[in-house]
Amino acid sequence: MIEFDNLTYLHGKPQGTGLLKANPEDFVVVEDLGFEPDGEGEHILVRILKNGCNTRFVADALAKFLKIHAREVSFAGQKDKHAVTEQWLCARVPGKEMPDLSAFQLEGCQVLEYARHKRKLRLGALKGNAFTLVLREVSNRDDVEQRLIDICVKGVPNYFGAQRFGIGGSNLQGAQRWAQTNTPVRDRNKRSFWLSAARSALFNQIVAERLKKADVNQVVDGDALQLAGRGSWFVATTEELAELQRRVNDKELMITAALPGSGEWGTQREALAFEKAAVAAETELQALLVREKVEAARRAMLLYPQQLSWNWWDDVTVEIRFWLPAGSFATSVVRELINTTGDYAHIAE
C-alpha cells in the first residue's frame, strides 16, 4: 500500500516548504449545509463558532447543558480542534418552549444562532465547507503561485487526506490487523473507522496509479463517469469516447475511481482491468470489505476547488480561500502546493 506522503502528485512534487496551522486562526472552516433551518420541529439547529475544541466535545457539552443524552446531539461532520470553525449541531428537544442557548458557555466556543428544525442533522448531510488558510514561511513563492494558477485549471487529486487513516496511520493498521486475523470487532466506532480507512486507502491507490498515466483526464473504454456534483454514474463506451472526452475537458463530466467493496465496482472492460490491477496486491483489505458487506461505490478522481483565490501578505505568507464539496479534504489541496511543516500539517478538517 502506498503511504499517503508518497502518493502521486498531479502537478509534480512541490519545490518549496511552508508552515500550515502555525496557529488555529490560520485554518478557518465555515460549514455550508446548503439549507436553512425550518423554523419549527422537535430539533434545534445550533450554529457554533469554536476555537480549540473538537466537535464531539462541544456536542457532549451542549447535551449536558440541555439535560439530554449525548446521542440526541448530532452533526454533519467532524471539524478540526486546531482551527477556527463554524458548524451546525442538532439537538433533539421536543416541546414548544425554546431553550435559551445564548446562555450556553464553553471556553473557546460561541453560539452564533439557533432555530427549530424538523429533521435530525445526519452525518454527511452538508453541501460543503468554505476554507480560509494561511501558509507561512513559504520558501518558494514563484512555485506556489504557478501551482495555484494550474490548480484553477486542472484541479488536484481527490485523495482522502491522511487524517482519514488516523494518527500515524492507526486506523489503516487496525483494518489490516482485522483483515489478517478475522477476529470480530465489537466496537462500532473502531469498525467504522477501520472500514472507512481500508476503502479510502484502496481508492487513493487507484487514483495514484491512474495519475502515472500520460493524461489522468483521458477517458478510456469502460470508465465510470458522473455529472459534476452528482453521485450517479454511467459507463463510457468506445463509440462515445470523443464526445465524452469533450464533456470531461469542459468539466461537465468527471472520471471516477472505485471505492472498493462488495458488488460490482461500476467500471467495465479496460477501466475495470486497470482498477483491479492497481489494488491486486491488497487482497486482504478487499476481502475484509466484502466480508463486512461494505458496498462498492464511486468517487470523482479529481477535485476542483471552487471560488479559489489567494492574496500574498508578503513574499513568504499567503492567504488562500476556496470552497470544497462535502467529503473532500483541504489538506489534499495544500499537498499540491507545498511540502507542509508544523505539528498540525495533517490534522483533520
Curated annotation (Swiss-Prot):
One of its GO terms (biological process) is tRNA pseudouridine synthesis. PROSITE patterns: TRUD, UPF0024. Keywords: Isomerase, tRNA processing. One of its GO terms (molecular function) is RNA binding. The active site is at 80 (nucleophile). The keyword Isomerase applies. It catalyses: uridine(13) in tRNA = pseudouridine(13) in tRNA. It holds the Pfam family TruD. Its EC number is 5.4.99.27. Residues 155-303 form the TRUD domain. Substrate binds at residues 27, 129, 329. Coiled coil: none annotated. GO terms for cellular component: cytosol. InterPro entries: PsdUridine_synth_cat_dom_sf, PsdUridine_synth_TruD, PsdUridine_synth_TruD_CS, PsdUridine_synth_TruD_insert, TruD_catalytic, TruD_insert_sf, TruD_pseudoU_synthase. SUPFAM superfamilies: Pseudouridine synthase (SSF55120). Responsible for synthesis of pseudouridine from uracil-13 in transfer RNAs. Belongs to the pseudouridine synthase TruD family. This is tRNA pseudouridine synthase D.
